[in-house]
Amino acid sequence: MKKNVQIKGTKDGISIFLSDKASISELQQELTQLLADQKQNPYSGEKLEVQVQIGNRLFSEEEEREISTIIHENSQMKISAFYSNVMSKDEAKKWKENDQIFSMATIIRSGQVVQVPGDFLLIGDVNPGGQIRSNGNVFVLGNIKGIIHAGFEGNGNAIVAGKFLYPSQVRIADKVYGFDSEDYKEVTETDLFSAFVNDAGEIVIDGIHKIRKIRPEISNFQGGR
């Protein structure tokens, strides 16, 4: 008969596998017994971190707490994380939102803030004082003179594409690049450029063609002067 609780060593360290076919009470009983049996070989070092794989189910916070308590009190292990093959409705909704491309054809004027959960395509200009916030990438088919914040919730892999003019500012996650120096003040027309965070953790401004190389998953964006 297949055990409902198994402890295995993996390439990522120690993992405890809990069957998604068993009830929580069955798992608690078998886990307690398995850990009690292993106490015959005491370990005196620091507590070892362990991952708990729970299969095609979700535990409530209370159930996670109960499993954590059993492991903490009956072994020299501590849980680093619970891993499930499924996601909650809230997680699924957020994933769907972040995977969408939102688009608008308008002008973002001073004082306006447009915020979207996924990628954003604007056909129009961003005036000084206007701002776009996106959890994903931002593509602007127009002049950028305001603030563009891609990867708003911390996605450092996000990119921005558009015509950057004085006094625009590009933000990607927590990085900032400004076009507010005197060098940019007299520039009234420019080509489309891309902005991204390089391996050194700095925002780089480069040709639009670089998007395909640095972010190959973005392959359908095309733009021209």
From Swiss-Prot:
Xref: Pfam families: MinC_C, MinC_N_1
Keywords of the record: Cell cycle, Cell division, Septation
GO process terms (BP): cell morphogenesis; division septum assembly; regulation of cell septum assembly
Superkingdom of origin organism: Bacteria
PANTHER family: SEPTUM SITE-DETERMINING PROTEIN MINC
Homology family: Belongs to the MinC family.
Function text: Cell division inhibitor that blocks the formation of polar Z ring septums. Rapidly oscillates between the poles of the cell to destabilize FtsZ filaments that have formed before they mature into polar Z rings. Prevents FtsZ polymerization.
Subunit organization: Interacts with MinD and FtsZ.
Record protein name field: Probable septum site-determining protein MinC
Source organism (scientific name): Listeria monocytogenes serotype 4b (strain CLIP80459)
